[in-house]
Amino acid sequence: MSDINHAGSDLIFELEDRPPFHQALVGAITHLLAIFVPMVTPALIVGAALQLSAETTAYLVSMAMIASGIGTWLQVNRYGIVGSGLLSIQSVNFSFVTVMIALGSSMKSDGFHEELIMSSLLGVSFVGAFLVVGSSFILPYLRRVITPTVSGIVGLSLIKVGIIDFGGGFAAKSSGTFGNYEHLGVGLLVLIVVIGFNCCSSPLLRMGGIAIGLCVGYIASLCLGMVDFSSVRNLPLITIPHPFKYGFSFSFHQFLVVGTIYLLSVLEAVGDITATAMVSRRPIQGEEYQSRLKGGVLADGLVSVIASAVGSLPLTTFAQNNGVIQMTGVASRYVGRTIAVMLVILGLFPMIGGFFTTIPSAVLGGAMTLMFSMIAIAGIRIIITNGLKRRETLIVATSLGLGLGVSYDPEIFKILPASIYVLVENPICAGGLTAILLNIILPGGYRQENVLPGITSAEEMD
């Protein structure tokens, strides 16, 4: 097998290339447009579900951006053993949203006030992050269960998110406007523009395809009256990080639940970093790959420690950006530095970041549907790289069946205890846990003929 597995896309700027400032800026803005709303959404969802004050919710949003900027800087620059050295963007981990809501709602029903709820949720998040730090040092020993089979599930589970946004998002479902002509029309317009610009021969136009598509969709949304500016009217002018703003408290019961999600997030990080390495034309096996995995997971843990301390939900590497890399052809980690600085600035000045939250879901969905599909393709490539023997076929089929099945109807396991249900309702967790268990249970000697031969050259993957 070749040392480096190509992603099947033409890179304009490879990992160590230094793009001119204007091209780096376009690339950074493209990545920001892909992640900004998903980055701030978890804080908004948790704030609304727990009925937190507007001030607290705004602070959570700002700290999510600042922590993401710090984490991205660590990942792309790779200080010593910390960081993947890839264009790995950090953002809030959606896996924690339902857990935080469940734990916070339980405390709220018991009469705890907002400050104590936040101190407890952030406290267990702070301690739990050290589990990820520890896991980074034993990744080689977890190789039997954390495999490319597990990694490939990540991208495949994201397509539903893009489609829902394409139709207007969850808010549109609640209001009864989901899938109306306005949402579908705007989403389709963005999709067509992004595809069109990605077919251009001009590298600059190709790099800016997603950003241009979103701008065109935003203008169309303004004309249709779909843009709501109410969320930016009462935001403060500037926000400064305040470590342990709500104090620090700890619950061992909550730690067990949050700690489990943290350990499962290692699966997600391994998959995201593997996909990033692949689309960046770096090895997905061997010493360099293992070093990047260790550094990336270690950075995930350390950044979540920082995030929890300043008041953000836990962070992880973001899979969405792998689709941006593949579509734009920009894998330079130096673009990541620009992204990191911009995220910190957006966090310090929430009025600037608030503007991006006004982008309608349908506009984002038009671009994300294509990006998530590209991520799914990268995941499939990861799965088939080493070939699928009969044992691996059973593992892939079962884990994908349960993982994707849960994404279609998360309530299928609702009869289970709440502490278990919050794990298996997540497609990545459900599919990942299934793959892990089958990797442990199925005998290693059960390896018959290849059902799908492995890819051994870049040409075969194109």
Q: Could you describe each region identified by the protein language model?
A:
Residues 22-34, 179-191, 208-209, 223-224, ...:
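Hydrophobic, membrane-embedded alpha-helices of multi-pass small-molecule transporters
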Residues 2-7, 39-43, 47, 189-200, ...:
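Juxtamembrane interface elements at the cytosolic ends of transmembrane helices
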Residues 59-60, 81-96, 144-151, 205-212, ...:
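Short, non-helical or kinked segments that cap or interrupt transmembrane helices
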